[in-house]
């Protein structure tokens, strides 16, 4: 087999395995069984994020067993785009999720992204990084209670809690360069270590 035919084979394999998936930005995100919210528009993002992040996740399967994942990522978020690119420890791109204008687009050459509800990942990112007031209004419009506690004015650390009928659904906390999101209702969590931004 020649080098050209080997290269052609691998290119064909990459193209054949490439998956894309797109959903409208107005698709509902159910934080409880009865209530949902729409994603906030990217224009609600008042800060700029352009940095590496380390993401570690854990979730409980329906049979009660747990599973976990971890990935390096580069996150770019501003008032026009939210983009999360996931990498392996060797720097190989696993996939990219992009939220721009009115749709969420995901693509990967190693994962079938159509099986993932990528809008939920975007929604959780918004809980961690978007301005509190915009989030509060969006959640309260749907009948949830969303609160934030900070230890002082100007302090970037926070504890954010989403609840319904007095029951906590999720908590997101930021302490220094660490963010932890725990969804008690859906039994999953993320731990994000923030890197140095541009």
Give the location of each predicted region:
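Mature, soluble, non-transmembrane domains
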Residues: 18-34, 42, 56-58, 74, ...
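C-terminal motif of bacterial Sec signal peptides marking the signal peptidase cleavage site
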Residues: 13-16
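A short, Trp-centered hydrophobic/proline-enriched beta-strand micro-motif
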Residues: 41-64
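Sec-dependent signal peptide recognition
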Residues: 2-9
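Structural recognition of beta-strand segments within beta-rich domains
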Residues: 64-91
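Short acidic/polar alpha-helix capping motifs at helix-coil junctions
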Residues: 34-36, 69-70
